């Protein structure tokens, strides 16, 4: 015996729920959110596939707005739609139209940056073809052409263009400054400093009241430098081993290149064990002093 036919209302309910999900607009913002927007556009394309492509009437196409990565043709090759931005999901197969196609200067690549050994599946993401920095006509350095084009489309009235390849010339800028700190005699102290500049900056350390560049001839003070962590940056450290009361004072990180100089001070407070016991940690914290361990943890934070 055949089961009784389902009422028409029951058959239509799943379709209505799907349409409600599909047609719900994504949250607004300068850069579209990858998840909801992809689901909406992808399911809309799947629904359209069942109907096939209607005759193309460009005059009936809605003009897309806010396309920071430019425009591409839709699945039927008729109307324009916003292209996908860098970092958004995309269709590896050019003939597919679920996630969408990447914009100008972008290409769809498998992102293998995840931990494949733990079962993470590579995703197809839009990636910029070039990773070379550029100087914009606004005097700002852009990490690559795709970022500059996004900024240009976000601010069309600015007439932003490429001034020249490579970063804009810039005086030094302190990216991560040394922090005020304290410690007990006999312990080690480290100050850190990161400087951005183009041309590259040099870093030196000085102490208020001394005319020499550290470390001088002091065997318990050492300095170290390395490039990075980002391009056109340099990082410097000042280490004082087994601090003494005479080490107390203000130390300065100085960054300079041909276009200028910048500096950032940090104070060191040195306590004897007796002073520490009589003063107490709460009183020290009221002076806005940061212990060495906390200062190091803040310096290791990603500042981008």
From Swiss-Prot:
Q: Supply one GO CC term from the record.
A: extracellular space
Q: Does the keyword Secreted apply?
A: yes
Under SMART domains, the record lists: IG (SM00409), IGc2 (SM00408), KAZAL (SM00280)
Q: Does the keyword Cell membrane apply?
A: no
Where's the Kazal-like domain?
A: 120-170
- One GO MF term attached to the UniProt entry: insulin-like growth factor binding
Q: Which UniProt keywords apply?
A: Developmental protein, Differentiation, Disulfide bond, Extracellular matrix, Glycoprotein, Immunoglobulin domain, Osteogenesis, Secreted, Signal
What residue stretches are annotated with the Ig-like C2-type domain? 172-269
Known Pfam families for this protein?
Answer: I-set, IGFBP, Kazal_2
Compartment annotation: Secreted, Extracellular space, Extracellular matrix
This protein's major location comes to: secreted
Q: Which residues form the IGFBP N-terminal domain?
A: 49-129
For this chain, the annotated S-S bridges are: 53-76, 56-78, 61-79, 67-82, 90-108, 102-126, 135-168, 193-253
Superkingdom of the organism of origin: Eukaryota
Q: Name one GO biological process term.
A: regulation of signal transduction
Which residues are sugar-modified?
159, 183, 277
For this UniProt entry, which residues form the secretion signal?
1-30
According to its UniProt entry, the function of this protein is described as: Involved in the proliferation of osteoblasts during bone formation and bone regeneration. Promotes matrix assembly.
Protein's UniProt name: Kazal-type serine protease inhibitor domain-containing protein 1
Which gene is transcribed and translated to give this protein? Answer: KAZALD1
């Amino acid at each position: 015996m055949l089961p009784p036919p389902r009422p028409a209302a029951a058959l239509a309910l799943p379709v209505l729920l799907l349409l409600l999900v599909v047609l719900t607009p994504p949250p607004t913002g300068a850069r579209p959110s990858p998840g909801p927007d992809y689901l909406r556009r992808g399911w809309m394309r799947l629904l359209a596939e069942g109907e096939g492509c209607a005759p193309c009437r460009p005059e009936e196409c809605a003009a897309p707005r806010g396309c920071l990565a430019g425009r591409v043709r839709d699945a039927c090759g008729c109307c324009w739609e916003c292209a996908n931005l860098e970092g958004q999901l995309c269709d590896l197969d050019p003939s597919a139209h679920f996630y969408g196609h990447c914009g100008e200067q972008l290409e769809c690549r498998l992102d293998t940056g995840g931990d494949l050994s733990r079962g993470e599946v590579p995703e197809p993401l839009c990636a910029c073809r070039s990773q070379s920095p550029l100087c914009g006509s606004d005097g700002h350095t852009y990490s690559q052409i795709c970022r500059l084009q996004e900024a240009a489309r976000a601010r069309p009235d600015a007439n932003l263009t490429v001034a020249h390849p490579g970063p804009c010339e810039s005086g030094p800028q302190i990216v991560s400054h040394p922090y005020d700190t304290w410690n007990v005699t006999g312990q080690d102290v480290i100050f850190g400093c990161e400087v951005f500049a183009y041309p590259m900056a040099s870093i030196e350390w000085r102490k208020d009241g001394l005319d020499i560049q550290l470390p001088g001839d002091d065997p318990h003070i050492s300095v170290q430098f390395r490039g990075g962590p980002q391009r056109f940056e340099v990082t410097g450290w000042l280490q004082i081993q087994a601090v003494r009361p005479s080490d107390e004072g203000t130390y300065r990180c100085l960054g300079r290149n041909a276009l200028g100089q910048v500096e950032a001070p940090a104070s060191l407070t040195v306590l004897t064990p007796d002073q520490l016991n009589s003063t107490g940690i709460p009183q020290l914290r009221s002076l806005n002093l940061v212990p060495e361990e906390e200062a190091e943890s803040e310096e290791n934070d990603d500042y981008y």
